Amino acid sequence: MKYQQLENLEAGWKWTYLVKKWKEEEAITCHIDSSEAEAAIQSLLTIEHEPTKVIEWIDKHMSPALENKLKQAIRAKRKRHFNAEQVHTRKKSIDLDYRVWEKLAEKSQELGSTLSDTIEYLLSESNRTETVTKTVSDIRKDLSDLLD
């Protein structure tokens, strides 16, 4: 699925990504000399709110090893950004114990569906079971009232 590219917004994401990698002490520049690398990083830190300069900095100074990783990170960020605009594509996350996740994954494979679809199915089955149990209980009560 294609998503519209927003140059200014994505330049900000790229800047954030590069600074994060730099703080994690990864080599983000193509420079071998540490003084050149440090100067390039200092110039990156000063151009946060200047998208065109960020793009120029990337073209001139970024390590080739980071190129694919940056593209993948931006593609994922772009997808999350556009999916968050609509309720039905917005993703939510939940924390599950490993054993619960394992059982859910097993049930998903049995049903041949996604984890989300499996959760939805199990909830609807649970609701149906509650409804049937309540109906049976009501019938038993009515029957016992009639017999008394």
Swiss-Prot record:
Domain of life: Bacteria
Pfam name, any one: MatP
Alphabetical GO biological process terms: cell division; regulation of DNA-templated transcription
UniProtKB keywords: Cell cycle, Cell division, Cytoplasm, DNA-binding
Presence of keyword Magnesium: no
GO molecular function: sequence-specific DNA binding
Main subcellular localisation: cytoplasm
Entry's localization field: Cytoplasm
Function: Required for spatial organization of the terminus region of the chromosome (Ter macrodomain) during the cell cycle. Prevents early segregation of duplicated Ter macrodomains during cell division. Binds specifically to matS, which is a 13 bp signature motif repeated within the Ter macrodomain.
Complex formation: Homodimer.
HAMAP family: MatP
Record protein name field: Macrodomain Ter protein
